[in-house]
């Protein structure tokens, strides 16, 4: 009996040592997660980073919220200017002729105003001008044709909240911040803890001029999260009006997924801006981007087709490398990103353990 007890104790000790070694190997192998956030300009990368701050840090304090005031103001001004300047080329008239003078006053006011001067609340005169313009059906008609010129996705959201935003006590909300458009330049690193792991997320500027900086981030990358704006299928690049944005994203994804730097890196595809895509696909057929498409116009059929166009670009051969982990996302929806990132984390951990021979 004593001999049996001794053998059992030894077995327990060995089991405990093995468990400790496995835990040590797991921490050594997985410990720090380096995520590279890539994609073309305006695909939603920076919004994903802001969501990580909301979900896994403390969000934005009052000082940081205040810092977004001029960003929101500037976004609104630039959006209204873009709309007003697009109306004539698109042959769209104001419903109320009085708005012509309002438009001239608005454009004239901002000819020599820089972003620094937008740090305070809109003046009463300016907010009234914007309200009158936004109420005009001609302006709203122009917004519906935003695929024919360059307009921020957030324009309609902000203009519908004009009364709140034009208040002298305005403090940007979490949703306002998530929708703020700030062009990414250089490389922005965000560090946070999740599931006892240290994540380092690198957001890289998506415009063509910024991409040469990506190479410096390639070392020891755990996973690449590649963002695509589904809603860009009928848009042109801001920096090259001859290039369809979706085609540009596909070329970029091809160069990333088949890059020798990423042979042992998990590739995660975020098919983003699902909410905008769902609205746009109702009146702009997918064939404007993919002439070969012969399916229906439902959100499921069209989004799945775009997913397949990206996944087929993957030429990696081994079973461990071949899978692309695709997710349909709405980067401004915190609950959606919470759910998706949880699934992404599990994929990353599992793949890392596999590469370390622990899975």
Swiss-Prot record:
One of its GO terms (biological process) is adenylate cyclase-modulating G protein-coupled receptor signaling pathway. One of its GO terms (cellular component) is cytoplasm. Disulfide bonds: none annotated. Residues 34-47 are annotated as: G1 motif. Pfam families: G-alpha. Keywords: GTP-binding, Lipoprotein, Magnesium, Metal-binding, Myristate, Nucleotide-binding, Palmitate, Transducer. Residues 268-275 are annotated as: G4 motif. Residues 329-334 are annotated as: G5 motif. A lipid is attached at residue 2 (N-myristoyl glycine). Residues 176-184 are annotated as: G2 motif. InterPro entries: Gprotein_alpha_I (IPR001408), Gprotein_alpha_su (IPR001019), GproteinA_insert (IPR011025), P-loop_NTPase (IPR027417). GTP binds at residues 39-46, 178-184, 203-207, 272-275, 331. A lipid is attached at residue 3 (S-palmitoyl cysteine). One of its GO terms (molecular function) is G protein-coupled receptor binding. It comes from the Eukaryota. Expressed in ASI neurons. Belongs to the G-alpha family. G(i/o/t/z) subfamily. Guanine nucleotide-binding proteins (G proteins) are involved as modulators or transducers in various transmembrane signaling systems. Acts in concert with npr-15 to activate TGF-beta-like daf-7 secretion in the ASI neuron, thereby promoting larval development and inhibition of dauer diapause. G proteins are composed of 3 units; alpha, beta and gamma. The alpha chain contains the guanine nucleotide binding site. PANTHER family: GTP-BINDING PROTEIN ALPHA SUBUNIT (PTHR10218), GUANINE NUCLEOTIDE-BINDING PROTEIN ALPHA-4 SUBUNIT (PTHR10218:SF349). This is Guanine nucleotide-binding protein alpha-4 subunit. The gene is gpa-4.
